[in-house]
Amino acid sequence: MIFIDACFKKPTPYTPIWMMRQAGRYLPEYMEVRKQAGDFLSLCKDYKKASEVSLQPIDILNVDAAIIFSDILVVPLEMGMNLRFEKGEGPIFDNPISTLEDLEKLDDQNAHKKLNYVYNALKLTREKLSQNKALIGFCGSPWTIATYMIEGSGSKNYAKCKKMLYQNPELLHKILNKLTQVLKLYLEEQIKAGANAIQIFDSWASALEYDKFFEFSFSYMLEISNFIKSKYPNIPVILFPKGISGYLDRIDGNFDVFGVDWSTPLDLARDKLSHKYALQGNMEPCRLYDKNAIKEGVEKILKTMQNKAHIFNLGHGILPDIPVENAKYFIKLVQESSAK
């Protein structure tokens, strides 16, 4: 698999590419299946439909890897939190965590066993996927998942989380540790079900100041990565902490690929990290609105990463109103322009 080879810094015939949120609302085919499912969470839980939408970008765009269709918040959901998605508001937990008692109510022993719909979707997708295409499993980082569990929803300033971080750091560490143990088992089950690679999304990494990022986020991501790498050395682990270009000097640990977001200059990440890791990223997602902007972005990134291990991706998820034609153009352009 070209994607897996690139993760391990092996030579590839061209630069492999996939897109975050590639199974998503910009595809009419996705919208049709989502309509049939009823709502977002029902789609996540219907493993046949989740598999179908995971495969759509392979069939429509010819990307080099599929990522399983799911959501990072199914983990706290199956630990016992009440999750719902409100239109225009995103995810909401009706019972956010603010005390040790709240935390102790959550089931960390059986949560990974209740996520069979994810494993079944992975199994089915791997069966249907051609052998040269990789299948990516994923989870959120403990910190990013915890922000939703504590805030009760998305947040602009993470005031509740940060209040806990500074007033009661022991409780926050207990929450993060509990999540970390569940996520290890969850990812292991994903690998057993057919995932060829794992990505850990730390979407809200940049909410933390320098030292606190390494204490409350990165250390837990590394604990998960160390667990996976010790048991499954042939499974590449991708870490994607978003928005921490100022923290790259201290990025070190046992993982394979560093995901670069679009706000981080790729040459900076290359100079600091490419001797240790393959890099993934990092085109500005809004460039996909315009073919000239796509061409310019692709050329610049391929030039920056010339002769370095690289997986092409956007620097964040594809937006819902991107024309499919532009997404197809982007994928083909990367594969053809980078062909050795």
Curated annotation (Swiss-Prot):
Alphabetized InterPro entries for the sequence: UROD/MetE-like_sf, Uroporphyrinogen_deCO2ase_HemE, Uroporphyrinogen_deCOase
CC terms in the record's Gene Ontology section: cytosol
Record localization: Cytoplasm
Site positions for Transition state stabilizer: D71
Binding site residues for substrate: R21, Q22, A23, G24, R25, D71, Y148, S203, H316
PANTHER family attached to this UniProt entry: METHYLTETRAHYDROFOLATE:HOMOCYSTEINE METHYLTRANSFERASE RELATED, UROPORPHYRINOGEN DECARBOXYLASE
NCBIfam families: hemE
Function: Catalyzes the decarboxylation of four acetate groups of uroporphyrinogen-III to yield coproporphyrinogen-III.
Record-given protein name: Uroporphyrinogen decarboxylase
Organism: Campylobacter jejuni subsp. doylei (strain ATCC BAA-1458 / RM4099 / 269.97)
Name of the gene encoding the protein in the UniProt record: hemE
